[in-house]
């Protein structure tokens, strides 16, 4: 089974870049002192190898079979991984496997989801929400906040801590084969406001939001799951068009950002 190590391509850009990041939205109602005490105590109990392994989130099969359970047991008890991203499947299998995996782990596993419009993006037997392009036409952003809360509650029911959403890419290239309906639209302002409202809804119920695909995957013509798309624009264009939604997201105190698999010569011309 092919395994993808998500900690390299998927980078959590902690929002220490903004003043509000000193008090992230997700933690505004949390007991910071108690959390930090727990984290410090767990960290001190881990070996250097275990600390490194905590950075790894592995994509695994969502199939409740003896063979898959054996694979998961090895990853957790031998490799000491920090988290899981389940592939597509059913809610029943994922719930069973989540409970099984958590029972094996010395440190509670971080369970993640790539669910831009909720569980149904990955789990076949769950309630389905509209895709982002449809929601981009909604005039009232408070509805996007409530939508985010609904998705967050779905995640909580499944023991999911992190959702790799929202998409902050501006859908500016009609030849883009991979963003399209996943974007909230072609308006910079609309994408920013809709995505931030959705992310705040997620985080209001305790699910970490991870915006993507920094610094912007909207104006590409190739699929980053299959190759390395080129973003040919100048730094000036990037800072005026692609970057602003991510800056607004950071300034709102939201928690995580995923870096896209992109070739951006304006920032790094090396091959």
Regions found by a protein language model. Give the residues of each.
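Bacterial Sec-dependent N-terminal signal peptides
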Residues: 1-27
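Short leucine-rich amphipathic alpha-helices used at interfaces
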Residues: 22-23, 27-29, 33-34, 71-72, ...
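Mature N-terminal segment immediately following signal peptide/propeptide cleavage
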Residues: 31-64, 70
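Short, well-ordered coil/turn segments that N-cap beta-strands
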Residues: 54, 80-82, 106-109, 160-161, ...
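Enzymes and membrane/adaptor proteins characterized by extended Gly/Ser/Thr/Asp/Glu-rich
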Residues: 61-69, 73-194, 213, 218-234, ...
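Phosphate/pyrophosphate-binding betaalpha-module
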Residues: 201-210, 224, 237-256
